[in-house]
Regions:
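Nucleotidyltransferase catalytic core that binds NTPs
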Residues: 1-181
């Protein structure tokens, strides 16, 4: 089975994340997309929701998509989440699967800052999702996937903007739990 990993803080998950997963399932030779929420990320500050809340929001957002799953491996690893460690554990824990990693333009640009980025490029294939008209500089050996991207970020949503870019079930959960207020 070929699995595409979509990693991120998903704080909260929004329609842009789902669009990447849907596009990957349509355009790439993959069987499933696994959403991999970071337990603790080294390159972002200001995380608002707990790991459990973020996982629950992902489950609500992907409900009904049988080829999308949540993978909580980074919680099992504990501590700061580094992609190199996650990839090595995935390969060890699921030796019969083949993995690739899905990232957006923002992460592709920051990729040289990732821990062991050169080794990581040897471990797994990366697919960068970008607007078809945008020319971005990405590391060698990365595959570009053009798509219609939504203009939204989780940070904007945490600030109370663009709430319409949340799946309804996630928006209801945020309201019920009083997250990001």
């Amino acid at each position: 089975m070929r699995i595409a990993i979509l990693g991120g803080s998903f704080d909260p998950i929004h329609l842009g994340h789902l669009q990447i997963a849907k596009t990957a399932l349509k355009k790439l030779a993959i069987d499933e997309v696994w959403f991999m929420p970071t337990f603790s990320t080294p390159l972002k500050q200001g995380q608002q929701a707990s790991f459990a809340d973020r996982c629950f929001m992902i489950k609500r957002a992907i409900y009904g998509y049988r080829r999308m799953k949540v993978c909580t491996l980074e919680q099992q690893l504990g501590g700061t989440s580094y992609t190199i460690d996650t990839v090595k554990r995935l390969k060890k824990q699921y030796p019969m699967h083949e993995f690739c990693w899905l990232i957006g333009m923002d992460q592709a640009i920051r990729f040289p800052d990732w821990k062991s980025s050169e080794e990581l490029k040897q471990e797994i294939d990366f697919y960068v999702f970008s607007r078809g008209s945008e020319e971005i500089e990405v590391p060698n050996d990365f595959h570009k996937v053009a798509m219609e991207l939504y203009d939204v970020s989780s940070q904007e949503i945490r600030q109370g903007k663009k709430l319409y870019m949340l799946p309804k079930s996630v928006r209801m959960y945020i309201g019920k739990k009083g997250l990001y207020i």
